[in-house]
Amino acid sequence: MENKPKPSRILGIDFGMSRIGLAQSDERKIIAMPLITVHTEKKSEQTVIKLLETISQLCETQKCEIEEIVIGLPLMMSGRTGFLADEVKHFAQLLQQLTPIPIRLWDERLTTVQAERSLRESQLTRKKRSKVVDIVSASIILQSYLDSRC
């Protein structure tokens, strides 16, 4: 019996100081789908290890591989970087040191605003919105990246 290669996907990340939202593409890399939220640890290194373990478990469960990771870079409206953008860059560097998967930073300006607006329109309670806003933001970041590839 022939071993079929595992389908590959692209992973989207919305990094936050307390939570990280994850989204993934479909096999054709056209549509972004929300996945899960990972809570951060006190130290960045611990968060990266926890995230890689989570990604590994997801890949095992879904029998897929991640070919690329897209991390939202929160630029200011002027295009300049601020404190959180510097934290994202540091996080991306730590992640790249521990995985051979290529990592790309992607402009995420206003994605959280867009996610919150979409969730308000969906009639979810504030409590439910707060639980999913990070994965919806990750999906928006990833979808923007996927759309740019067409």
Swiss-Prot record:
Pfam families: RuvX. It is found in: Cytoplasm. It comes from the Bacteria. Keywords: Cytoplasm, Hydrolase, Nuclease, Ribosome biogenesis. Belongs to the YqgF nuclease family. Could be a nuclease involved in processing of the 5'-end of pre-16S rRNA. This is Putative pre-16S rRNA nuclease.
